[in-house]
């Protein structure tokens, strides 16, 4: 410990003590005042959904216990103004410095700029760190014209990065910084992250998930040692242990992406040495996923409007169909397409979906129903346990053809064919659509083609206990083609001659 500075550590989505650059720097320099500030009003339209708030509540309780074991105390504050709360903490503690780790979503970018500005005005030192990415967004010069190049570079960087020990160990001990004046702190319960009506539903989450940074470490080790080797093979399955389940831990910063990268990269090197092709392929695929996460932050950092506008300018003229009844049917899993409906019902029940299913249901909303992609993005934000604004923005823009490297806008994937590919035995369908459980596998992904005798024997009555298709595939393709033509016509009419540079 080189000095005895008084430092406030502002926790946000970095709820861990291991590999936390802001906490490590503050602990090295002197006494520490850890604080988490909850300001619902500032979240605006991106106020976290029920499942996400439940996770945050559990994670904060876990972090509080960990900091207490190190001799410190996490101060929790609920406020109408983050800036005011931080300034109150500075006055109460006599702190001369505030540190935190970067966030890259549109809400945080604006808030962080304001906080830094107000603190500097008052002569308070401010330092922010990269605690969320393998690579800093500032490493790339990003324009709309080179988005694909940036994606390729981030993916390649994650495959080629050295495996040096960049993970910071937890502090052995923290020197607490006491507040001379009263700070209006509260308990985890008083933050209001969970109301009484939500608790019965959240009890189901408790059975399936264990939030907290030390639990994240266990999940990572389990995945790396037992499941990573089959990751590529299992990526085409939507049932069983086919994903890492790390995304909520990464979103809340309970484990650092550098730690995840380091573990996977070490396995990749070992498998390459041993000429284990299956393992190498799996590690490569997983590391490219880490690169995609970095890419989402790089794009949001350079184009903070992406939660509201398409990155490709001509798609701003696409004639989306703002049909609330279709949107409701999609949300409730009543589209008549089993794989889509199973995914949406799983989402509502658990706050979770396999990434492959996320792509399928979002593509259906955008391409089959022509629903505004921003509607789907917002619904994912409201319901996903691991709702991550940067990843969701890029995911929905990708599906809607709004990225240079995204799905072609005219690409229409048949959910029945995808069902046969990713759920060949119909296990996933039967789990989430019990009304179709008795239907033979031959028909389970396209019950509208099944003979009436088969439907009757299986207890299925289309239009009664299971929906008829909300739109016929040929009709959906025709409507999509017309919408694309109208987009091009509108672009020509107003003189939009291509991408903005």
UniProtKB/Swiss-Prot annotation:
Record keywords, A-Z: ATP-binding, Chromophore, FAD, Flavoprotein, Nucleotide-binding, Photoreceptor protein, Receptor, Sensory transduction
MF terms in GO: ATP binding; blue light photoreceptor activity; deoxyribodipyrimidine photo-lyase activity; DNA binding; FAD binding
Comment on bound cofactor: Binds 1 FAD per subunit.
Chain sites annotated for binding FAD: 231, 243-247, 386, 388
SUPFAM superfamilies: Cryptochrome/photolyase FAD-binding domain, Cryptochrome/photolyase, N-terminal domain
Residues engaged in binding ATP: 356, 405
Summary of subunit composition and partner proteins: Homodimer.
The protein's name in its UniProt record: Cryptochrome-1
Gene source species: Sinapis alba (White mustard)
Species classification: Eukaryota, Viridiplantae, Streptophyta, Embryophyta, Tracheophyta
